[in-house]
C-alpha cells in the first residue's frame, strides 16, 4: 500500500492562517492575548528634608514612608496600617498574648537578655536608632 506524499499530509493538517511546520506535531499555536493587570495604588517611598514636599504628597492621597535607618516592627506596622485599612483591622483584632506574657516576667530577666529584639518599640529610643549587628566600617 503506497504512503501519501509528505506535501499531502501537511496540506491536510495545516489550518487556515498557519504556516506548515517542518516537523509533524510541532505546530505553534499563538497564545491568547491577555488583559493587562490592574495594580492598586503603589506606595511612594521618598526621603526628603523638605517637609512641604512630604505634606503635599500626603494631601494628594499618596502615602509616604520615610526611613533612614533599620526599620523596626513598629515602623513597619505603622507603614502597613497607613497603606492598607484592611490590614489595620486585622492587626487590631489580633490577640496580644506575647506582650502580656513578657510583662509578667521578672523585671531582672530583661537585664540578662542581650538581644535587640527584647527591647521596647523603636519609638522609645528614637525612630532611627534601631540596633545594628554590623560593626561600623563593615558592609553586609
Swiss-Prot record:
<feature type="compositionally biased region" description="Basic and acidic residues">
    <location>
        <begin position="98"/>
        <end position="114"/>
    </location>
</feature>
<dbReference type="InterPro" id="IPR040312">
    <property type="entry name" value="FWCH1/FWCH2"/>
</dbReference>
<feature type="region of interest" description="Disordered">
    <location>
        <begin position="1"/>
        <end position="39"/>
    </location>
</feature>
<protein>
    <recommendedName>
        <fullName>FLYWCH family member 2</fullName>
    </recommendedName>
</protein>
<feature type="region of interest" description="Disordered">
    <location>
        <begin position="83"/>
        <end position="140"/>
    </location>
</feature>
<feature type="compositionally biased region" description="Low complexity">
    <location>
        <begin position="118"/>
        <end position="127"/>
    </location>
</feature>
<feature type="modified residue" description="Phosphoserine">
    <location>
        <position position="21"/>
    </location>
</feature>
<keyword id="KW-0597">Phosphoprotein</keyword>
<dbReference type="InterPro" id="IPR029279">
    <property type="entry name" value="FLYWCH_N"/>
</dbReference>
<dbReference type="Pfam" id="PF15423">
    <property type="entry name" value="FLYWCH_N"/>
</dbReference>
